[in-house]
């Protein structure tokens, strides 16, 4: 048996800051190639890649305390090493912020998932990570066809949700809402997808905007520590991800996800800002038209549509940052292979 690249596993080695992680390569008996570039960054190359081969970035740990995706990724890589998991797609697995994971916190100095725009930012540990990730994305997608590029950025929600799993599709100037991507969501039993209506500064948006990748930010359950995640509730997602890596057709039934459009973004403008609900309110809590749910200065925050729902509410953000998304359920269709809505 070929000696493993890892002392214990991809995840365990990534989080063991007492050992050095040097670049290393390995070719498995089935011809699959593994390339460990640095701590938390592993490329997996199928035996016979072509120009049609999917090139998939599977990232997790952008927020250090969101650990369920790390456990799923670690299990998949173990099965790739053993030969149990078939590999027909070229993949880049990323555990982005091990130091934050070890501290059991989302970030150390600044929210990493708000640093992927082209604005000037103050130097922080997270900014250095974002700069490194941008280079990894550039190098991974180099000399590949745009239609083959995917990026699944895996997260967990910090609060309860009416939808245990959901995804956010970034808004870009490119066609990045393909039928294949929606089919993947349905196969993974992701309960809902939010269709963003404006650019953002997230990791998945960066890949979609700059490299035309089929990209999603995926929220998989609730934040928990390693070993305490309810992975049994993510079985369909795990199967769908494994099928994507193997370029295999799913054997289980799909479940169509609910589509939401982002009706507006609430940005905090004043020191005097608050919501009328507590911090435990669930994502996708809805309001009736005209219902007031907070204030920003002397301006009331109210629902502008019936059943308008709130996602990612955070009263503690700095002035100028997003305090919530407001979303409405929407009917969609495909035009020329792309998901659209009126």
UniProtKB/Swiss-Prot annotation:
Cofactor: Zn(2+)
Pathway(s) where this gene product acts: Amino-acid degradation; L-arginine degradation via AST pathway; L-glutamate and succinate from L-arginine: step 5/5
InterPro entries (UniProt xref): AspA/AstE_fam, AstE_AspA_cat, Aste_AspA_hybrid_dom, SuccinylGlu_desuccinylase
Catalysis: reaction(s): N-succinyl-L-glutamate + H2O = L-glutamate + succinate
Pfam family, one: AstE_AspA_cat
Keywords attached to this entry: Arginine metabolism, Hydrolase, Metal-binding, Zinc
UniProt xrefs under Gene3D superfamilies: Zn peptidases
Entry EC number(s): 3.5.1.96
Disulfide bond positions: none
Binding site for Zn(2+): 63, 66, 155
Any one Gene Ontology BP term: arginine catabolic process to succinate
Annotated catalytic residues: 219
MF GO annotations: hydrolase activity, acting on ester bonds; succinylglutamate desuccinylase activity; zinc ion binding
Cofactor note: Binds 1 zinc ion per subunit.
NCBIfam families: PRK05324.1 (NF003706)
Sequence similarity: Belongs to the AspA/AstE family. Succinylglutamate desuccinylase subfamily.
PANTHER family (alphabetical): ASPARTOACYLASE, SUCCINYLGLUTAMATE DESUCCINYLASE
Function: Transforms N(2)-succinylglutamate into succinate and glutamate.
Protein name as annotated: Succinylglutamate desuccinylase
């Amino acid at each position: 048996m070929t000696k493993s690249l890892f002392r214990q596993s991809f995840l365990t080695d990534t989080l063991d800051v007492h050992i050095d992680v040097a670049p290393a390569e390995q070719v498995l008996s089935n011809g699959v190639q593994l390339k460990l570039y640095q701590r938390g960054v592993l490329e997996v190359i199928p035996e016979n890649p072509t120009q049609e081969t999917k090139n998939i970035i599977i990232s997790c740990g952008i927020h250090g305390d969101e650990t369920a995706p790390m456990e799923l990724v670690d299990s998949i890589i173990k099965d790739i090493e053993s030969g149990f998991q078939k590999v027909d797609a070229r993949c880049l697995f990323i555990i982005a912020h091990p130091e934050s994971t070890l501290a059991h916190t989302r970030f150390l100095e600044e929210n990493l998932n708000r640093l992927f725009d082209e604005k000037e930012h103050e130097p922080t540990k997270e900014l250095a990570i974002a700069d490194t990730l941008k280079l990894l994305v550039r190098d991974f997608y180099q000399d590949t066809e745009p239609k083959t590029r995917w990026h699944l950025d895996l997260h967990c929600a910090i609060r309860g949700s009416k939808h245990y799993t959901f995804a956010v599709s970034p808004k870009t100037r490119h066609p990045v809402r393909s039928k294949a991507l929606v089919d993947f969501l349905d196969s993974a039993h992701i309960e809902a997808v939010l269709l963003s209506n404006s650019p953002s500064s997230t990791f998945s948006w960066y890949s979609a905007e700059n490299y035309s990748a089929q990209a999603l930010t995926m929220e998989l359950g609730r934040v928990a520590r390693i070993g305490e995640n309810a992975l049994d509730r993510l079985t369909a997602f795990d199967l769908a991800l494994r099928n994507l890596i193997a370029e295999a057709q799913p054997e289980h039934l799909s479940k169509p996800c609910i589509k939401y459009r982002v009706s507006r973004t609430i940005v905090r403008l004043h020191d005097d800002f608050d919501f009328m609900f507590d911090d435990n309110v669930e994502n996708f809590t809805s309001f009736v038209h005209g219902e007031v749910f907070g204030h920003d200065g002397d301006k009331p925050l109210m629902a502008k549509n019936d059943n308008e729902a709130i996602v990612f509410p955070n009263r503690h953000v700095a002035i100028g940052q997003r305090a919530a998304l407001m979303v409405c359920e929407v009917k969609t269709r495909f035009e020329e292979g792309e998901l659209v809505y009126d």
